[in-house]
Amino acid sequence: MSVFLVRHEHRAEQCPAADFAAGARLLNRLSRTTAARYGVRIRADAVLAAHTLVMIAEADSEDLLRAFLQPFETVGTVEVELASTCARVVAGGGCASSSPVLDATVPALDPEEACQQALDAGLVVHRAHPLNCETPLPALTGGVVMPNARFYVRNHFQIPHLDPAAWRLEVGGLVDRPLSLTLAQVRALPSQSAVATLECAGNGRVGLEPSVPGEQWGVGAVSTAEWTGVALTEVLARAGVKSTAREVVFTAADRGPVEGLDGPIRFERSLSVSQLGSAGALLAYAMNGENLPVLHGYPLRLVVPGWYAVASVKWLTRIELIAQPFRGHFQTDRYHIDGTPVTLQEVRSLVIEPRPGQLVEPGQRVVRGVAWSGAAPICRVEVSIEHGPWQPATLTGEVRRHSWRWWELLARFEGHGDVAVRSRAMDLAGRTQPEQPRWNPLGYANNAIHEVRLTAG
């Protein structure tokens, strides 16, 4: 949905508040329930002067918003201006950049174009078909959210081409009331936003010895965004989950061949019904205040905060409640450790500044990095210089349940030559990064202590 600034003015003799009944009708018009029927969401309203009303509203188009505002036009003037949000400006690179329009149509993305966009954004491309690329460490430096163009990309199959007008979210299986929702209907439901860090389960695979098959991710398959959408539990409550349901299967539109299997398969993952209450899962249609990009699942994706990103199914088309454990390929043959599906992100930290290989002059210098955990908030980060004693770093920024946390330490560098800077994090659940990776055949959940090598002198 696009964000609009609305300004309504009327003359004193036309003031609707002068008539109690007319004023009540306009107040009812501004109610959330009425606005939702018109596909409009009112974020805020204020009276600037005696006869001037200002609103911040969201709608799929200006035409829809003006239809909702028609009663106000009968008693005065209505000006509608396309606006933006702070998250959108930050994600877009600043105030000088053009503001993207959040509408119901996003063009299909050609695979070659997608790869070129990733290269232009400075991402490290591991594979072009399907596109897989990570964010370089220096690009992680900054605020809480990662600009959409620099958000790492993980695909298993080619990017699907979806017509938003024809797209539907089907909810079925063991439910009382099967649903078939259009994108507009999904967006009209009560919305919420969450800042959440997504990390590929294979992040850090390149650090495993002996090496294992799979995309050889460095440590940049992780990014954070503000996701906006509808709570999964809201949609399931409308469908009515039967008491016999045990798992929820999420089916994506992307599909392709898998070695050893007959024919193409779709990407599918599941959550257990018992996990729904604590997962805080969102059906997201916006990312950092703009339309969910095609690369990241437009028109709708699942976001499961705190879990490895394989659970956050992109290009979502169907939700099905089933009575038995789901046995899909990406649930049982991949994304598991010793037979147990990967779920919560392991506690982890990265050294972001100084950069690997950077020349550091003797003396004091700030070491910065980021830390996150799926189980609980980060409570402590420690840094070691050249295998010296562990020193506590200062945690900065706001504490968010499912978002990474920045940290910094004023460290002293002495001598000349190669210097190792290491970081380790702890969370409130008592988990600490291990000294060495926990090797497993598929190369998942490597959260070993991060080390960068610098040159002092």
Features from the language model and the residues they span:
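Short amphipathic alpha-helices in soluble, non-transmembrane regions
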Residues: 65-73, 185-186
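Structured, non-membrane catalytic/scaffold regions adjacent to prosthetic-group chemistry
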Residues: 106-457
